[in-house]
Amino acid sequence: MDYNKAALALHSKYPGKIAVQSLAPCKNRDALSTAYTPGVAEPCRKIKANPDDVYTYTMKGRTVAVVTNGTAVLGLGNIGPEAGLPVMEGKCVLFKEFGGVDAVPICLNAKTKEEVIAAVKAIAPTFGGINLEDIRSPECFEIEAELERDLDIPVFHDDQHGTAIIVLAGVLNALKVVGKRIEDIKIVQNGPGAAGTAIIHMLQVAGAKHIIAVDEHGILVPGRPAGLEGHKAKLAEETNPEKISGSLAEAIKGADLFIGTSIAGALTPELAATMAPDAIVFAMANPTPEIMPDLAKTAGIRVIGTGRSDFPNQVNNVLAFPGIFKGALSVRARDINPAMKMAAAQAIAGLIPDDELNEENILPKAFDPRVADAVAAAVAQAARESGVARV
C-alpha cells in the first residue's frame, strides 16, 4: 500500500482527522436556553463557588491537550506548528480510538521554552491533562519540569515517558525469556536524548544498576574530551558505574541489553556479536533500526524489538499513553508520577502470560483490546496509593 498517497487522500477528505461533536443538541428554544444563556449561568455560579465542580459540569475531566511547537516532529525535525498539526490530530485520534479520551491539538507558534511554558499555563484551566509532543531536546526536559511543578493537572511528555514505559514492559518480559534479572545485567543505551534519558531513568527505578549511555561522541563519562552539556552531564554522573570511556565498541562488549534511540545501522552485526550470550536488543531508530532483526539474529541476539509494525515485538507508544491518561483522568490525578509509570509498564508486561512468552512475543499488539483498560486500572490504583488522586 502506498501510505503517502493514502494519507494525502485521508487528510484532505474532510479535511483533517478530528471534529467537535455536540453532546447537547439545540433543536428548540428550551434546549438552547439550557445549553447557553440564561441556563448556563448556573453551572458557572457552581464552579465559581467550588472550583472542583468544573469536573462535574464541563469537559475538563475527560479532555487532554496535545501540545507541540513543531520543533522535533517525528523524523522530520523542526517543521513548525502548522506542519506539525497533522501529527497532533493523529495523536488525538489515537487518544479517542484506543482510550476513549477526548484530545485537542494545540500547535504553538512559540520559539522559546518560556513561550511554550507560558502558553500551556494559560490554557491549562480547560484541560484535565497536558500531553507534550514533539518538542526538541533539551528544552523538552525544562518545559515538562516547570509545568509539572506549577500545574495541578498531569503533564506527560510522551516522547520521553511513553517510550520508556513500553521499553521497560518489553525488557521485563524479555528478561523472563532469557532467564536474567534486571539487577544483574549490563545495559547500553545508545542515543540519550529525550526518549533515551527517560528509558535510563525508568530502568533505574526498576532496579537496573549497570547502565552505560553512549552518544555520537562516545560513552558518557565525567570529564570526557568531547565535553558534556546539560542533561548529559547529569547522566554521566548517574550511569557508567565503572566510569569507562571510549566508543560504542567498548561499551557493548559483554552487554546483556542494548537499547537504541539513535540512528540506522548504529549497531553493526560485528558489534552485536560481542554482546553477552542470550542478549536482548531494542533497536528503535525509525524507519530503519540500529540493526535489522535478521542481522541481529545472525549475530547471536536472542530477543529483538523495534519500532516497526512489520517485525515482532513492536515498541509502540499507543500501548501506553491512552490508558495512562484514561486512568489519570478517572481519579482526577494531579500528576503522572514514577509509581504510575511503573504500574503502567507492569500492566502492559502482565498482559502476556508467562506460558505465552517467547522470543517473538514480549509485548501486546497495538490492537489488543485489553491494553488501555488494564493500563488505566493500574495507573488509577497507583495514583490513589501515591496520594495524587483527587477522587
Give the label of every model feature segment.
Residues P105, N131-D134, V155-D158, Q189, ...:
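General beta-strand structural signal in soluble alpha/beta enzymes
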Residues D150-A164, V281-N286:
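Short, acidic/small-residue loops that bind anionic groups at enzyme active sites
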Residues A124, I182, A251-I252, A272-M275:
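A short, aliphatic-rich alpha-helical micro-motif
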Residues N131-D134, L257-F311:
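ADP-ribose/adenylate-binding Rossmann-like module
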Residues D158-D159, V178-K180, A283-V391:
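Adenosine-phosphate binding glycine-rich loop
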Residues L74, I79-G99, H157, H161, ...:
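Glycine-rich phosphate/diphosphate-binding loop of Rossmann-like nucleotide-binding domains
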Residues M1-V155, A376, Q381-A382, S386-R390:
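N-terminal ligand-binding/catalytic initiation module
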